[in-house]
């Protein structure tokens, strides 16, 4: 059973729209400059149990949720892939998109069963000497934002059409759960946990 570090039920930075995101524990790459080195050890964080799975599924069922993003650590590591696969299958059943960030390259993992459920793969290790804060959805220039289904069909890597543009929000794909709420209702529903 996998471990994970964090679940975010409405993340807007790791793929388009509001996304259910999980940071799996364990990573064999240990990239210099990694933004989440606390996830490197496979037994760090907490056990990905039935409750964690239910939290992710519930987040994916929300109408404002555009999809699932698998992060880490390394979501495709042998000790994480069964849980990552399960979440990807559930997300697709709900009509959601699936994004996955991996230190592997597409060519190395293209034959994994999970790939038929992944829409977009951000591949390759983070290389600090190739860091560029202007890149969309990735941190270093060697990483690629790949349209997985188009790549599988073409037999070669097909980049996501929006991978080299400046980051933007996708209002046509997102639902604002607070649009019809008063500031008091928003505070009561979402912010009281901080008081």
What function would you assign to each model-found segment?
Residues 1-23, 36-43, 157, 162-164, ...:
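N-terminal [4Fe-4S]-dependent radical SAM core
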Residues 2-6, 18, 36-100, 106-114:
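Conserved Radical SAM active-site core
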Residues 19-34, 74:
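Cysteine-centered iron-sulfur cluster-binding motifs in ferredoxin-type domains/subunits
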Residues 76-84, 88-92, 131-181:
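P-loop/Walker A phosphate-binding loop and immediately adjacent motor/lid segment at beta-alpha junctions
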Residues 113-116, 139:
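Short, conserved loop/helix-junction motifs that constitute active-site signature segments
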Residues 119:
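Receiver (REC) domain switch/active-site residues of two-component response regulators
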Residues 125-128:
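Short, acidic/turn-prone active-site loops that include or flank metal/cofactor-
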């Amino acid at each position: 059973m996998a471990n994970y570090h964090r679940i975010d039920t409405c993340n807007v930075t790791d793929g388009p729209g509001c996304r259910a995101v999980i940071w799996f524990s364990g990573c064999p790459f240990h990239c210099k400059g990694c933004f989440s080195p606390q996830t490197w050890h496979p037994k760090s964080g907490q056990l990905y149990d039935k409750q964690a799975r239910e939290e992710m599924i519930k987040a994916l069922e929300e109408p404002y949720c555009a999809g699932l993003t698998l992060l880490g650590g390394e979501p495709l590591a042998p000790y994480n892939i069964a849980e990552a696969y399960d979440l990807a299958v559930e997300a697709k059943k709900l009509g959601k998109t699936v994004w996955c960030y991996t230190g592997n390259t597409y060519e190395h993992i293209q034959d994994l069963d999970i790939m038929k459920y992944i829409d977009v793969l951000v591949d390759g290790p983070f290389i600090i000497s190739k860091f560029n804060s202007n890149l969309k959805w990735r941190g270093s220039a060697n990483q690629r934002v790949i349209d997985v289904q188009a790549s599988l069909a073409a037999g070669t890597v097909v980049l996501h059409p929006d991978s080299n543009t400046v980051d933007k929000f996708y209002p046509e794909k997102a639902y604002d759960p607070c649009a019809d709420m008063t500031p008091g209702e928003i505070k009561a529903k979402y912010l009281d946990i901080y008081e």
